[in-house]
């Protein structure tokens, strides 16, 4: 054990999910603000999700301005803490790995185990809240598209498939805004859950994320690609999710989440009085023609074509993250009226 003295002071709770609580905190020595995610390791599924995120975040050797950065991960057992590192031979770390692999608790259940992820603090809420509290703005739309495509290209270059890309998992940082002319910085967060490797186990062995097939059920219905519904997918599923997000952002398409009753940005297909996720509808009818734009009278031809390709039923017909980034840059800077 390293220390029983807290390094961070928790200020307030800023978010709560199915397997963790996020706090705004300050580093005692520097007073710098950070976000701290506290994950209780009381069930094998919690441990597995936490370790996946830790392995993905810690595998990234460089930083990107639009991807959340993991400062450190701290493992707590009762009142004692230690810094956790990938590949550690610490008995506590190995117990968590064993729990994840076996699907059953491999440590004394009477002890309280927690993982604390210390990350960038984002002060502007999430992309969903930010956009829906403001009028549509072409400059903001352009900035957000370019930032998201850059983040996705970076993740895929680092063999990371997000698997749950949606506006709620994209955070807003406004701390560096010097003037009202600057757009906020986006940070892709939660998810980052799968590091692809040729062996499936060695993160140091690179492989194309577009050839790394996954089968674990992941994602949120309205952003899931057809092949995710089937349970056999690659990184092209992230391209589909981003297509849903961009289409919804440009046209301000929203739906009401049936559980939370919250209004969310997201595209869908209408079937009678029902709204159906695009991916689910395409799984049932791969030849279905998507009506784009659905609310506006018109849309720039190149933008419309790109969104349709991102939402292709066949993942092989979608651009990869690197082509997507290039094409969005070309549309943003070469087509002066791209959004109309």
UniProtKB/Swiss-Prot annotation:
Gene Ontology CC terms, in alphabetical order: cytoplasm; nucleus
InterPro entries: CC_SR_Kinase, Kinase-like_dom_sf, Prot_kinase_dom, Protein_kinase_ATP_BS, Ser/Thr_kinase_AS
Binding positions for ATP per the UniProt entry: 14-22, 37
Main localization of the protein described in the UniProt heading: nucleus
Compartments reported by the entry: Nucleus
GO MF: ATP binding; protein serine kinase activity; protein serine/threonine kinase activity
Full protein name: Serine/threonine-protein kinase PDIK1L
Organism per entry: Pongo abelii
Annotated family: Belongs to the protein kinase superfamily. Ser/Thr protein kinase family.
Domain Protein kinase: 8-333
SUPFAM superfamilies, sorted: Protein kinase-like (PK-like)
Residues forming the catalytic site: 164
Database matches in Pfam families: Pkinase
E.C. numbers: 2.7.11.1
Keywords, sorted A to Z: ATP-binding, Kinase, Nucleotide-binding, Nucleus, Serine/threonine-protein kinase, Transferase
GO biological process: negative regulation of G2/MI transition of meiotic cell cycle
Species lineage: Eukaryota, Metazoa, Chordata, Craniata, Vertebrata
Swiss-Prot/TrEMBL catalytic activity: L-seryl-[protein] + ATP = O-phospho-L-seryl-[protein] + ADP + H(+); L-threonyl-[protein] + ATP = O-phospho-L-threonyl-[protein] + ADP + H(+)
